[in-house]
């Protein structure tokens, strides 16, 4: 396809159509200081010169910080073989064909991914993945709305505020009633949640561990939701599912997760992976694609797209999703990581992360004026309350090369002095001891 630039007349016509006086007006939201002053490109440079220029730009990013940030996105170790396997041309550049059975390797990879996450979550069905944890939770909510034909959802305030923003944005014009039930010191208010779920409720939406890191059992709440005809939706942390009570064991109808922790780099926020699993009774409401295994006429094993509710495959008005092929690569990375790590390795990863977090909580709890937000069990992160503003604490420690955690006051009123502190298996006791010393000195 040749590249033919637009004529001045065509550009003028497009600007008139959107009501812009000139091209610069299209970029008015970008501060002038950040806009390039000229688009005159220099002459070609050598590879060595380009590399030096890129390294100079890259040096502006700090990579020497010891980070205790979490909040849904975690710095776990990724096996070196992951990048090598993912970079194979058959996977890295392949596109999902519109005659999908022509690509048996891609379909088998999707099928194996679905099998792995179903086992991890203790659920019956999975799709090929969606964009991220937030969109997975939204899609789960819409599954519940379609299934129950109700327009009310009860959402715990302990669900990630980032996810709740996604829910509010996507449902803004869908006339859904999102009832957010306030937390109690970083814990789910079971009494209030139970009272909020009634005969008009499509879904109850919770998270485990919740955004504050606390671990709770939702079995009784899900039983109550079932009695009211509502769908139980839970958002999870995949790595910890090997040591916590699973969504399936709690009786969840739909379990979602942010799959970033399964081998995807943090990478400035993406691309990530939305994991979606559900009970078989809800599989027809599942968005995206679902790969299945069958036998051909000759009795040989073959893989097919059993369900494909994406708009590229069926009529738009019938589609439940427009999730595209890029997610298959992210799902493949999660599968590779799960296979390389194994169930035992994932359990060790989870146990070490929890052990480090408990050690950090013990060390910080010994600092005068510092206390935990609550006494509930937690996974690999916890909320600590300081006698001064948490943002101020974070700034002081960053100057010394430590990111101590996420200031909860950004999303929760009344918690301006609280930090969400996360540990993974990549931290050691020396890191945590240094964090405790710096915090004590800062206070």
Swiss-Prot record:
Give the Enzyme Commission number: 1.4.4.2
Domain of life of the organism in this record? Bacteria
Catalysed reactions, as listed in the record: N(6)-[(R)-lipoyl]-L-lysyl-[glycine-cleavage complex H protein] + glycine + H(+) = N(6)-[(R)-S(8)-aminomethyldihydrolipoyl]-L-lysyl-[glycine-cleavage complex H protein] + CO2
Q: What is one GO biological process annotated to this record? A: glycine decarboxylation via glycine cleavage system
Molecular-function annotations in GO: glycine dehydrogenase (decarboxylating) activity
Q: Which keywords describe this protein according to UniProt? A: Oxidoreductase
Identify the Gene3D superfamilies for this entry.
Aspartate Aminotransferase, domain 1, Type I PLP-dependent aspartate aminotransferase-like (Major domain)
Name the enzyme's class. Answer: oxidoreductase
InterPro entries xrefs: GcvPA, GDC-P_N, GDC_P, PyrdxlP-dep_Trfase, PyrdxlP-dep_Trfase_major, PyrdxlP-dep_Trfase_small
- Mind telling me which Pfam families this protein's record contains? GDC-P
Q: What does this protein do?
A: The glycine cleavage system catalyzes the degradation of glycine. The P protein binds the alpha-amino group of glycine through its pyridoxal phosphate cofactor; CO(2) is released and the remaining methylamine moiety is then transferred to the lipoamide cofactor of the H protein.
User: Family, per the entry?
Assistant: Belongs to the GcvP family. N-terminal subunit subfamily.
Q: How does it assemble?
A: The glycine cleavage system is composed of four proteins: P, T, L and H. In this organism, the P 'protein' is a heterodimer of two subunits.
- Protein's name according to its UniProt entry: Probable glycine dehydrogenase (decarboxylating) subunit 1
User: Organism, per UniProt?
Assistant: Solidesulfovibrio magneticus (strain ATCC 700980 / DSM 13731 / RS-1) (Desulfovibrio magneticus)
């Amino acid at each position: 396809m040749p590249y033919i630039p637009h004529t001045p007349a065509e550009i003028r016509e497009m600007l008139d159509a959107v009501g812009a006086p000139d091209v610069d007006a299209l970029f008015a939201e970008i501060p002038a200081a950040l806009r390039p002053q000229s688009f005159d490109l220099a002459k070609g440079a050598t590879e060595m010169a380009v590399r030096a220029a890129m390294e100079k730009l890259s040096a502006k990013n700090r990579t020497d910080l010891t980070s205790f940030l979490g909040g849904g996105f975690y710095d776990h170790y990724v096996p070196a073989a992951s990048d090598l396997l993912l970079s194979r041309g058959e996977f890295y550049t392949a596109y999902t064909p519109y005659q999908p059975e022509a690509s048996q390797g891609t379909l088998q990879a999707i099928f194996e991914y679905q099998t792995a996450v179903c086992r991890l979550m203790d659920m019956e069905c999975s799709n090929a993945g969606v964009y991220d944890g937030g969109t997975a939770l939204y899609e789960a909510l819409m599954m519940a709305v379609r299934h129950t034909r109700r327009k009310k959802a009860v959402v715990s305030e302990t669900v990630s505020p980032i996810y709740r923003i996604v829910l509010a944005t996507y449902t803004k014009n869908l006339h859904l009633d999102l009832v957010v039930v306030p937390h109690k010191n970083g814990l789910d208010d079971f009494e209030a949640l139970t009272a909020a779920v009634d005969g008009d409720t499509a879904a109850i939406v919770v998270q485990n561990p919740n955004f504050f890191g606390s671990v709770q059992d939702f079995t009784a709440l899900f039983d109550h939701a079932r009695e009211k005809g509502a769908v139980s939706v839970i958002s999870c942390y995949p790595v910890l599912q090997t040591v916590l009570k699973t969504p399936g064991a709690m009786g969840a109808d739909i379990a979602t997760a942010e799959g970033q922790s399964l081998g995807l780099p943090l990478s400035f926020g993406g691309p990530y992976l939305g994991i979606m699993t559900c009970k078989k009774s809800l599989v027809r409401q599942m968005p995206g694609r679902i790969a299945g295994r069958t036998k051909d006429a000759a009795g040989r094993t073959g893989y097919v797209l059993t369900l494909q509710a994406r708009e590229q495959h069926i009529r738009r008005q019938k589609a439940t999703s427009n999730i595209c092929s890029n997610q298959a690569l992210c799902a493949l990375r999660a599968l590779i990581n799960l296979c390389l790590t194994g169930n035992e390795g994932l359990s060790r990863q989870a146990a070490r992360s929890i052990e480090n977090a408990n050690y950090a909580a013990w060390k910080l709890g010994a600092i005068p004026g510092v206390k935990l937000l609550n006494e509930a069990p937690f996974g690999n992160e916890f909320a600590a309350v300081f006698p001064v503003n948490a943002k101020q604490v974070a700034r002081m420690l960053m100057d010394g090369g430590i990111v101590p955690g996420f200031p909860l006051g950004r999303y929760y009123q009344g918690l301006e002095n609280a930090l969400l502190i996360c540990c993974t298996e990549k931290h050691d006791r020396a890191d945590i001891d240094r964090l405790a010393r710096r915090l004590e000195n800062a206070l």
